[in-house]
Amino acid sequence: MEKMSKFSHLLKAHPCFNEKVHDKYGRVHLPVAPRCNIACKFCKRSVSKECCEHRPGVSLGVLKPEDVEDYLKKILKEMPNIKVVGIAGPGDSLFNKETFETLKIIDEKFPNLIKCISTNGLLLSKYYKDLANLNVRTITVTVNAIKPEILEKIVDWVYYDKKLYRGLEGAKLLIEKQIEGIKKASEEDFIIKINTVLIPEINMDHVVEIAKFFKDYAYVQNIIPLIPQYKMKELRAPTCEEIKKVRKECEKYIPQFRACGQCRADAVGLIKEKELLKEFFKEKNKEKNIKLEVFDLKHFSH
C-alpha cells in the first residue's frame, strides 16, 4: 500500500492501469522494438503500411529512436490529453537496445510523460535497474502459465543468452525468469500489471493460479481473450461469460483490469480510439512494406 501511495500520481493518469481514466487520458505506443526472443503460438507480428488489424504485435512501421522526439511533439500537439508513452513491440521491448535509447530521449525531452513498457519478462531481471534509472515505474508482463507443461503448449521456443530452448525446457526457463524478474521489479518499487491471454482449451482453469501466485507482487491483472490466429487459428476464443467467470475468480487475489483494447504496437490516443499516424510513417518509410527483424538468428523467425 505504501508503494501505491508513493506512485498514486502515476496511477491516477495511467489509462492502462486505471480503468476509471481510460476514456479521459490517452497513451502513445512507440513501435521501436521489432525483435522478439520467444515464439508464442498465437502471435503473428506484422509491420506494413497495409496492416489495418487492431491487435498486439502489429504496426505501420518501425520507429527509429532519432525520430521519437519529432513524433511525440506531433502527437502531443494534436492530442494534449496524452499522459503515457509506452513501448509494447511489435516484438519484446527488453530484447531491443532501441527501447533503452528511446526511453533515455523521453526522460530527457518529455520528463512529464509517464514511461511504461510491456514485456514477456524473460529479460526483466537483467534490466529492471536500467529501467529504474530511466524513471520507468510501470511495467506490464505477459504471463500465460506458471506450469511448464501448460506453457509449452503456448510457446514454441525461447531464445536466451544466445541459445534456443524448445518445448518444456523453454517453458521452464521462461517461467523461472518471469518469476525472478517480477519479484525483483516489485522489490524495486515498480508498479506491475500481469497480462494473461485466456485460451479456453489450454489455460482456462489455470489462470487463477497465476493470480494467486503473483498477488503479492502485481498491482493488477489484465485477462485478455485469445485472438485465434497463426498456430492457434483452429482454437476458439473465450466467450464473454467465460471471461467474466475467470476474472471473478482471479479478483479474489488481484484486482482485475477490464478496459483493455488489445492495442497495436503503434496505438495512439484513448484506449477506445483507433488512431494511427499514417502520414508520419509515410514520410519516414518510403518502402511499400517495412522489413521486420525477428532477432540476430533470422532463420529462427516465425
From Swiss-Prot:
Pfam families: Radical_SAM. Binds 3 [4Fe-4S] clusters per monomer. One cluster is coordinated with 3 cysteines and an exchangeable S-adenosyl-L-methionine. The two others probably act as substrate. Keywords: 4Fe-4S, Iron, Iron-sulfur, Lyase, Metal-binding, Nitrogen fixation, S-adenosyl-L-methionine. Its cofactor is [4Fe-4S] cluster. [4Fe-4S] cluster 2 binds at C260, C263. SMART domains: Elp3. Its EC number is 4.-.-.-. Pathway: Cofactor biosynthesis; Fe-Mo cofactor biosynthesis. GO terms for biological process: nitrogen fixation. Changing C36A: Loss of activity. The keyword Phosphoprotein does not apply. InterPro entries: Aldolase_TIM, Elp3/MiaA/NifB-like_rSAM, rSAM. Changing C260A: Loss of activity. [4Fe-4S] cluster 1 binds at C36, C40, C43. S-adenosyl-L-methionine binds at G91, T142, I194. Changing C40A: Loss of activity. Monomer. Belongs to the radical SAM superfamily. NifB family. Involved in the biosynthesis of the iron-molybdenum cofactor (FeMo-co or M-cluster) found in the dinitrogenase enzyme of the nitrogenase complex in nitrogen-fixing microorganisms. NifB catalyzes the crucial step of radical SAM-dependent carbide insertion that occurs concomitant with the insertion of a 9th sulfur and the rearrangement/coupling of two [4Fe-4S] clusters into a [8Fe-9S-C] cluster, the precursor to the M-cluster. PANTHER family: FEMO COFACTOR BIOSYNTHESIS PROTEIN NIFB (PTHR43787:SF13), FEMO COFACTOR BIOSYNTHESIS PROTEIN NIFB-RELATED (PTHR43787). This is FeMo cofactor biosynthesis protein NifB. It comes from Methanocaldococcus infernus (strain DSM 11812 / JCM 15783 / ME).
